[in-house]
Amino acid sequence: MKISKRQQDIYEFIKSEVKEKGYPPSVREIGEAVGLASSSTVHGHLARLEGKGLIRRDPTKPRAIEILSLEDEAETPNVVNIPIIGKVTAGMPITAIENIEEYFPLPEYMAAGETNVFMLEIDGESMINAGILDGDKVIVRQQNSAINGEIVVAMTDENEATCKRFYKEANHFRLQPENDALEPIILNNVTILGKVIGLYRDIR
């Protein structure tokens, strides 16, 4: 869609004012911002922007200028229901119904386009040095292998899912917490359930 430089300036000014203040500028303020002394000239540009579907005006209200694209930006993002796992049943797929505690509506973009993902709610402070806090939910891509140093969700001998940094060493596996006060978990065998690819934190 082609608009003039002046119309672009007016459009961007209205958009910035709405974002910053929560309401649109007056015609006088628009004129001052873009160097137009005549209010009728400003009205003319607004009419052209409205005709091109970029704004909507209410003639009964002086400041009722609506930026239509802001409605699009403010739309609720698509969500996907991601399973949250708890105690893991040995020999069962990680997302088997026996392992799922509940489903969490995650904004689709946070799943990074992955389809085989699950979430694990962090209990405790074993990963605080990695910025993963008690109560956070990690987003995990299902996979059964990992590279040394990657943060994974693995299954312990007690069939509990745990989030740790993974290391394969000479004759054992080390699941390393990111907390200087805690000792690593040393295992002869380890079952990797997935790699951590993201984090969800509720700050309310």
From Swiss-Prot:
CDD domains: HTH_ARSR, S24_LexA-like. One of its GO terms (biological process) is DNA replication. The active site is at residues 126, 164. SUPFAM superfamilies: LexA/Signal peptidase, Winged helix' DNA-binding domain. Pfam families: LexA_DNA_bind (PF01726), Peptidase_S24 (PF00717). It comes from the Bacteria. Belongs to the peptidase S24 family. This is LexA repressor. The gene is lexA.
